[in-house]
Each structure stands twice: as structure tokens, then as C-alpha cells.
Regions:
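Acidic, polar ligand-binding/catalytic clefts
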Residues: 63, 67, 71, 75-140, ...
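Sec/Tat signal peptide C-region and signal peptidase I cleavage site
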Residues: 18-22
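Sec-exported extracytoplasmic/periplasmic mature domains
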Residues: 30, 66-74, 91-95, 132, ...
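Bacterial N-terminal signal peptides that target proteins for export
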Residues: 1-8
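Extracytoplasmic small-molecule ligand-binding "clamshell" domains
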Residues: 24-99, 284-286, 298-301, 324, ...
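C-terminal functional modules
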Residues: 276-337
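Bilobed "Venus flytrap"/periplasmic-binding protein-like clamshell domains
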Residues: 35-44, 54-69, 123-175, 179
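Extended ligand-binding regions for polar small-molecule ligands
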Residues: 60-63, 67-69, 131-135, 139, ...
Length: 337
């Protein structure tokens, strides 16, 4: 009943927002900034430093949208949102786009009046435990108290996992990841569960990170990506192709350092990507230099990954399935033609 009521309210909010704000691109151009909904502080994805400067993989998508639409990656207002707040904020028009480690699911795509514009990080759910418990697998978690954030796919995946394996557990629920992690660190539960990338990030915030470990089990698929409102296909296209531009740039060997030189490339794909040939920007409602600015000011996907979450960052994440398709991964930009 609670879930049905939630979806009913969500649909109503979405319809109101769509009617009131039919052209997000025009609103953004008029105001001069992109209002981007992000996490309330997840290292590597969206986190502000002590000077208020935001960085992260999700932040880079926001910055890339601003570069494409407004000419500058700096023209972004970052709005931190909890798991519970994020969809309502987008539906109501409080933010223009949600780039907040959000999983693409059937219900979210169909019942909330929202559209997912793509995937900027492929992830999966796992578990973090204290090393001194001596656990090696999630199959040993029977009877465990598990800290989990409500209103997330994580909470539902957790229930599915224990039901499928006929094991008992005690969920300890919280409305924000920050409070859930704090409770786990204080010993109020045996386990904390989330996406593997989030576990790696939250582990760094614990009092003694080295006494905790992430179990190897992956119990779900978590395709994370940017989300926009239903009913504004031009904005959906622009956000989607912003992500594709970063992926295509990596595929074509174009990066922030060589993008000016690559304007001399003979490759038709590179020339279309950089606005030298064709008229791609017109169909998105922007000028033909949109993708050039993304690459010049933000970088290609590989640059963003390495800078924010890669092996040389505290998270030390490997590309894995987040490699390009030609390298054995899942990322596959649609053709620029």
C-alpha cells in the first residue's frame, strides 16, 4: 500500500512538472546554468570539498551538459539530494537532470514519469563487513543485521537475495546513506550493503577503513545513469548524446589534450564529433561545437573515470565492464551520423 501510494503521488508530481516545464533546454539557457541533482556526498561520484568545489564521475556528466548547452562546464548548480528526495526533486522541476548514482529499472522508467538517458557506470550490489568476522561469502550472512538505505533498489535486492537463498536477516533501515554508514561504523549492524562502487567510497570514510572488507559476491545488476523528466524529448536527447560524446571521444582517441589537433583529423566520425563537418548540433538545439567543448573542458569518458574513480584514486576501481565494447566492456556509443 505504501509503495502504491508513493507511485501515485510520484506520477501526479511528474505530470505537473511536465506541463509547467515543457522545454528544459530553453529554461536552462534563460537562467544560464544547469541545476543538477547529485548525491549528498559520495566520493568519486559527487562530493564537494571544503571550498565547495564539486568533483566526481556524476559531476563530470553535469559539467559536460553545461559545456554543451551553455559553453562553460562551470555553469552548473549542484543540488545534493538523498535517496528519498531525488525523484521528487526531478519530477517537481527543482532540478533539470538527476545524475546521482541512480539505477535504471523498469518501474522507475515507466511509473515515475521519468526517462533514463543512458548509463555512465555499470555496477552491482555487494556487502561490506568487518574482517574479524572471518566471512568469505554472502552465503554466510544468515541471521545478520544489515544496515541499508530505504527507497532504493538496494533494499529490495537485499530482500530478494535472502528470500532466494532461504536465509533469515534483520534489516536496519535508514533514510540516508550517511546515517546508514555511521550506524554500521558504530557497530549497530553486522553488514552494510550498497553498490560496490559506493561501498568502496564509504569504506574510506570509516574510522578504521582497513578493518573492513567488501565481499566478492555481486547480487544484482545496477546500471547507473542520468535521469530526466518525461515529455521533453529534446532535453532527453541532449543529455543522452552528451554521454555518448564522451564515450565516442574515447573510442576515437580524442581527449582534452589533443582535441585541438584532432580537428585536423581526416576521420569523418571525428570531424562530425568535433563539429567540423555535418550539422549535428542543430538537431540537439545547440551549436556544432557542443561536443568539442565537452571534450576540451571535461574530457572523454576514460579521462573522467581515471580522474575520479580509477586505479590511481583512493577508490582504486578497475574499468571492468565499464570498458568500451571494443575492449570487452559494455559501453557502446551510438553512431555520430
Amino acid at each position: 500500500m505504501k509503495i502504491n501510494k508513493f507511485f501515485g503521488l510520484a506520477i501526479s508530481a511528474a505530470l505537473i512538472a511536465t506541463t509547467a516545464n515543457a522545454t528544459t533546454l530553453e529554461d536552462v539557457q534563460h537562467l544560464g546554468f544547469v541545476n543538477c541533482g547529485v548525491s549528498d556526498g559520495l566520493f568519486g561520484f559527487s562530493k564537494a570539498d571544503t571550498n565547495g568545489k564539486w568533483t566526481g564521475l556524476d559531476v563530470d556528466v553535469c559539467r559536460a551538459i553545461a559545456a554543451a548547452v551553455l559553453g562553460s562546464a562551470e555553469k552548473v548548480k549542484f543540488t545534493p539530494l538523498t535517496d528519498k528526495e531525488r525523484f521528487t526533486a526531478l519530477q517537481s522541476g527543482e532540478v533539470d537532470v538527476l545524475v546521482r548514482n541512480t539505477t535504471w529499472t523498469l518501474l522507475r522508467d515507466t511509473a515515475l514519469g521519468l526517462n533514463f538517458a543512458g548509463v555512465n557506470y555499470y555496477d552491482g550490489q555487494s556487502f561490506m563487513v568487518r574482517k574479524d568476522l572471518g566471512l568469505k561469502s554472502a552465503n554466510e550472512l544468515s541471521g545478520a543485521a544489515v544496515c541499508v538505505t530505504t527507497a532504493t533498489t538496494t533494499e529490495r535486492n537485499l530482500a530478494d537475495f535472502f528470500r532466494a537463498n532461504a536465509k533469515e536477516y534483520r534489516p536496519v533501515t535508514f533514510e540516508s546513506s550517511i546515517t546508514a554508514v555511521a550506524a554500521y561504523d558504530a557497530g549497530k549492524c553486522d553488514v552494510y550493503t550498497s553498490d560496490r562502487s559506493a561501498l568502496a567510497a564509504w569504506r574510506l570514510t570509516l574510522k578504521e577503513p582497513d578493518v573492513h572488507m567488501i565481499l566478492p559476491d555481486v547480487i544484482s545488476k545496477e546500471p547507473l545513469g542520468p535521469v530526466v523528466r518525461h515529455g521533453d524529448d529534446q532535453w532527453l536527447d541532449l543529455v543522452r548524446w552528451t554521454l555518448y560524446a564522451m564515450l565516442e571521444a574515447e573510442e576515437q582517441g580524442v581527449n582534452s589534450k589533443n582535441v585541438d589537433q584532432m580537428k585536423e583529423s581526416k576521420s569523418p566520425v571525428v570531424r562530425r564529433l568535433l563539429g567540423i563537418e555535418g550539422n549535428m548540433g542543430k538537431h540537439l538545439g545547440v551549436d556544432n561545437g557542443w561536443a568539442y567543448r565537452i571534450i576540451k573542458q571535461v574530457g572523454n569518458y576514460a579521462e573522467s573515470f581515471e580522474r575520479n574513480v580509477g586505479p590511481n584514486t583512493p577508490l582504486r576501481l578497475q574499468r571492468g565492464v565499464n570498458k568500451l565494447w571494443k575492449d570487452g566492456g559494455l559501453h557502446y556509443p551510438m553512431p555520430f551520423r
